[in-house]
């Protein structure tokens, strides 16, 4: 149940009941990921993987008055699992992996939250890539083992702006800065904190050893 309350904990009001996923044997599947954005709750639900034709359900729930709409039904392939991480919302779009089974690479989608349709799909997305940020229809992200990248939606061109051969990078973009926390391997032996300006000039670096 989606509930609204005052900041002091009073005034609980039920807005909507979250959609349930029903298995063929009658069992109900609950839970998923929740993202609040611009007056909506975006809900990526756990699919009922026991059903032979399951796919990831994505819902948009209006906080006023609680109307629920399922998104991307025509675009998400069958047997698409729930993405455990890598989901982000930016500039009216949701970016999310579409994992199939246990593949190391999978499709990664850009979905328009207004139209409810997927507009862009990267077919070779590595699960260690970072989340995506959209500024003025240019996508910013880190590709594992490649570096910091920009994808211009107008031209369909990806550019590696800062080559960086690291196993993983958690990236945060602001208006003026880029902050990274990189890891050297799956064992996480060394963590490096980095700060750049938006022209990719290094401003600071701190190396942390695993304790």
Give residue spans per PLM region.
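N-terminal "mature head" segments of proteins
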Residues: 1-27, 31-34, 204, 209
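Beta-propeller fold detector
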Residues: 13-19, 69-75, 119-124, 159-164, ...
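Repeated scaffold domains used in trafficking and secretory/extracellular systems
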Residues: 23-37, 77-90, 125-136, 164-175, ...
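Solenoidal tandem-repeat scaffolds enriched in leucines and small polar residues
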Residues: 34-37, 43-108
């Amino acid at each position: 149940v989606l509930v609204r309350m005052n900041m002091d904990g009073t005034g609980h009001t039920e807005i909507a009941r979250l959609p349930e996923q029903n298995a063929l044997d009658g069992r109900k599947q609950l839970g998923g990921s929740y993202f609040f954005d611009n007056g909506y709750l975006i809900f990526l639900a756990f699919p009922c993987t026991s059903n032979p034709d399951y796919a990831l359900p994505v819902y948009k729930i209006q906080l006023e008055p609680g109307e629920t709409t399922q998104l991307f039904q025509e675009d998400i392939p069958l047997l698409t699992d729930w993405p455990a991480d890598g989901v982000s919302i930016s500039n009216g779009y949701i970016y999310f992996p579409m994992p199939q089974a246990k593949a190391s690479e999978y499709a990664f989608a850009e979905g328009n939250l207004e139209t409810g349709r997927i507009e862009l799909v990267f077919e070779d997305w590595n699960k260690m890539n970072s989340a995506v940020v959209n500024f003025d229809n240019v996508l910013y992200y880190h590709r594992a083992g490649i570096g910091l990248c920009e994808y211009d939606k107008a031209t369909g061109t990806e550019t590696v702006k800062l080559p960086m051969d690291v196993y993983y990078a958690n990236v945060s973009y602001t208006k003026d800065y880029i902050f990274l926390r990189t890891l050297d391997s799956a064992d996480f032996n060394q963590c490096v904190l980095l700060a750049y300006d938006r022209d990719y000039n290094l401003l600071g670096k701190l190396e942390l050893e695993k304790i």
